[in-house]
From Swiss-Prot:
GO molecular function: 3'-5'-RNA exonuclease activity; tRNA binding; tRNA nucleotidyltransferase activity
GO biological process: rRNA catabolic process; rRNA processing; tRNA processing
Source organism (scientific name): Thermosynechococcus vestitus (strain NIES-2133 / IAM M-273 / BP-1)
UniProt entry tagged with the keyword Transferase: yes
Keywords: Nucleotidyltransferase, RNA-binding, rRNA processing, Transferase, tRNA processing, tRNA-binding
Name listed for the protein in its UniProt record: Ribonuclease PH
Database matches in CDD domains: RNase_PH_bact
Subunit-level organization: Homohexameric ring arranged as a trimer of dimers.
Function, as annotated: Phosphorolytic 3'-5' exoribonuclease that plays an important role in tRNA 3'-end maturation. Removes nucleotide residues following the 3'-CCA terminus of tRNAs; can also add nucleotides to the ends of RNA molecules by using nucleoside diphosphates as substrates, but this may not be physiologically important. Probably plays a role in initiation of 16S rRNA degradation (leading to ribosome degradation) during starvation.
Reactions mediated catalytically: tRNA(n+1) + phosphate = tRNA(n) + a ribonucleoside 5'-diphosphate
Amino acid sequence: MGWQRPDGRQPQELRSHQFQRHFTQFALGSVLAQAGQTQVLCTVSFKEGVPKFLEGTGQGWLTAEYRMLPSATRPRQEREFLKLSGRTQEIQRLIGRSLRSAVDLSLLGECTLIVDADVLQADAGTRSLAITGGYIALVDALSALLQQGVLRKSPLRHQVAAVSVGLIDDEPYLDLSYAEDVAASVDFNVVMTGSGQFIEVQGTAEMGSFDRGTLDRLLDVARQGIQELIEIQQRVLAPSHE
């Protein structure tokens, strides 16, 4: 008998995903994203100016910041003040890279989009949920900028979503909870476009190693899950959900 998922899901079943748009008042785009017990507040803001390496190029930029509330995990974690942990820096760079791929930066002018991902509650999958929810917030932010006349043309290039997948008892499991993440011998974070192109694949063997066949199995399961998330994004962004 294989691994029994704590929440009763099938091995290749996503957690229940919910995205509440326009969650805060002042951000151009804001989404409360939930996947099972994991909750991430994703907001998108806009400011004039770009990093120094882009000054004078006429090109814009998108960057991301990621933080966890102290009570997002048990036990309470200390806030990160003067120095960010390596994990935090890695995750916010991943979010930034993933969502930058969705935008034609040349259409922004010398302006910057800032994606903030704040974890309210963590039961694994926070970086994946931040990307999937962050995309929805990004769409709303760009729509607001178009309505305000700040942008003349939408810079959106494609949809982006992400999911985790892991190997437990030699079987692929989709969208891992914390208990499953700990139990997995191999775990991946996969980011893809709406057309099925890969943006980023992060994979690690926690114990031992894995072969090419295992890699392909995990990516196939991740691709299936991301396609479901792409469809959820489309439903959430439909005019009837305004």
